C-alpha cells in the first residue's frame, strides 16, 4: 500500500467542473488513489467508473438545470419528475404559455435518465459557465 500525505481540502462545486472534481475526489478516496489526481484527470476517471458500473459516485456532482418546459428535452422533463430532483422555482408569469423551471439534482439522476447526456456533460466540462450552454444550443 502506498501512503499518501494527508491534506485538508475544502471542495466547492460552484460550476459543473467543480462538481466533477468533487466526484473524482470522492471516488479517489474510495479507491485509495488520491495521489493520481491531476488537472483534468476527472474526465478519464469518471468515464472509467461509469464503464465499470460504479455510478453512485456521480451523486457528488450537483447539477442545476433551468429552462422553459416546452424547450426541455424529454430527458430533462423526466429528470424534473425524479424523486431525487428538487424544484427551486416554477415561474408561471415569465411566459404565459410555458413554465420556467430551476431544477436541482445530481449527475447520477441525469445518468440514470440519459447516460449519453451525462457522458457529454463530463466530456464538455472543461468549458466554464455559460460556454457549456452556448455550445449545446
Across the structure, where does each feature detected by a protein language model lie?
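Family-specific signature for flavin-dependent thymidylate synthase
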Residues: 1-137
Amino acid at each position: 500500500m502506498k501512503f499518501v500525505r494527508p491534506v485538508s481540502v475544502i471542495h466547492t462545486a460552484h460550476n459543473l467542473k467543480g462538481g466533477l472534481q468533487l466526484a473524482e475526489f470522492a471516488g479517489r478516496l474510495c479507491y485509495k488513489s488520491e495521489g493520481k489526481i491531476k488537472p483534468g484527470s476527472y474526465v478519464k476517471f469518471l468515464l472509467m467508473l461509469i464503464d465499470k458500473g460504479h455510478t453512485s459516485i456521480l451523486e457528488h456532482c450537483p447539477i442545476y438545470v433551468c429552462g422553459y418546459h416546452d424547450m426541455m428535452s424529454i430527458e430533462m422533463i423526466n429528470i424534473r419528475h425524479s424523486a431525487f430532483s428538487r424544484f427551486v422555482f416554477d415561474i408561471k408569469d415569465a411566459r404565459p404559455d410555458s413554465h420556467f423551471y430551476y431544477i436541482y439534482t445530481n449527475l447520477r439522476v441525469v445518468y440514470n435518465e440519459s447516460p449519453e447526456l451525462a457522458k457529454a456533460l463530463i466530456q464538455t466540462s472543461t468549458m466554464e459557465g455559460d460556454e457549456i450552454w452556448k455550445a449545446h444550443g
